[in-house]
Amino acid sequence: MAGRLPACVVDCGTGYTKLGYAGNTEPQFIMPSCIAIKESSKVGDQAQRRMMRGVDDLDFFIGDEAIDKPPYATKWPIRHGIVEDWDLMERFMEQIIFKYLRAEPEDHYFLLTEPPLNTPENREYTAEIMFESFNVPGLYIAVQAVLALAASWTSRQVGERTLTGTVIDSGDGVTHVIPVAEGYVIGSCIKHIPIAGRDITYFTQQLLREREVGIPPEQSLETAKAVKERFSYVCPDLVKEFNKYDTDGSKWIKQYTGINAITKKEFTIDVGYERFLGPEIFFHPEFANPDFTQPISEVVDEVIQNCPIDVRRPLYKNIVLSGGSTMFRDFGRRLQRDLKRTVDARLKMSEELSGGKLKPKPIDVQVITHHMQRYAVWFGGSMLASTPEFYQVCHTKKDYEEIGPSICRHNPVFGVMS
């Protein structure tokens, strides 16, 4: 272990990629997961792009640099957590390693993360890119949910370190509810919710557009995003909240000032109901999506009820939040309250149905919030990759050359974690 350079931890999400070195508490770089490529190479499919290899190949930008580059086409290689364009992903990784981390990939072990329900073929592609293109000495592909559970140990609410729990991972593009038992994901019970950070931004944008005319149209999305991040919170009761704003507006209504990108003049808007209506779509999805009407508390309940009966109580007791979209104030408290109501109603009903003969033991419902929530997956990865055992469970270059990319289909669960 001594004298070894720290491992690199890279967590690629739909909206943002978090990267840094193991042992740190937060990622060194957080950047949009996008890549800007030359217009000419945009035309046609991947096969055609391969034909045009050459100088054009080196002409691309990633992250924040890629966002406003007019002659270039901005592409997002990851959709709903899963990599869709491997060519672009390889180029993205190239800049991450050499330009941002400034690392020599031959000298560092790598920990990459994968979303739930990622296919074994995708793991093989990842292994090929890392071992063939970058020649890394070792690679471990960790499941995001397990890392989020490990990160939750920093919370005061956690008494014992356990790898059994329900992870609610809500990022920019997708929200997953993932039950984990003893470090293994119960794949058949995972549910995904088609509401995440981006949907809240769009919904806030819609609300602002109806009411505030002063926002320049081309900036309405970034204004909505800023309003969401700065002012939004989750309220315990919608009707009471509306009354609060109606009776004492000056106390609750906030002001947001932005600068018009074209005229460079300031514009000011009032932010009222949007503050609590944005995140409310987690609990009333029908506000924003007429096709999906199940509140997040019911989804979590359904996921746990689908799991084997002997792990249900521990799953209710350890509900862990992870990802930027769970950062709204009081999100955890509201979720815990709604879920507790659902669970208590079920227990009461079973007692009534038995004619009072059965007295079910109350179920402890606990939603864990902690200050590492936003980068929980990355932080969990950083914790694990700084343990000596990490180097024993990594797949090495030697294994890869002997057996091939299929070695990365399975990544062992750490014993050291719990």
From Swiss-Prot:
Chief location bin: cytoplasm
CDD domains linked: ASKHA_NBD_Arp3-like (cd10221)
Pfam families: Actin
Listed GO CC annotations: Arp2/3 protein complex; cell projection; cytoplasm; nucleus; site of double-strand break
Subcellular location: Cytoplasm, Cytoskeleton; Cell projection; Nucleus
Gene Ontology molecular function: any one: ATP binding
GO terms under biological process: Arp2/3 complex-mediated actin nucleation; positive regulation of transcription by RNA polymerase II
InterPro entries the record matches: Actin (IPR004000), Actin/actin-like_CS (IPR020902), ATPase_NBD (IPR043129)
Function as written in the Swiss-Prot or TrEMBL entry: ATP-binding component of the Arp2/3 complex, a multiprotein complex that mediates actin polymerization upon stimulation by nucleation-promoting factor (NPF). The Arp2/3 complex mediates the formation of branched actin networks in the cytoplasm, providing the force for cell motility. Seems to contact the pointed end of the daughter actin filament. In addition to its role in the cytoplasmic cytoskeleton, the Arp2/3 complex also promotes actin polymerization in the nucleus, thereby regulating gene transcription and repair of damaged DNA.
Matches recorded under PANTHER family: ACTIN
Annotated family: Belongs to the actin family. ARP3 subfamily.
Subunit structure: Component of the Arp2/3 complex composed of actr2/arp2, actr3/arp3, arpc1b, arpc2, arpc3, arpc4 and arpc5.
UniProt name for this protein: Actin-related protein 3
Organism, scientific name: Takifugu rubripes
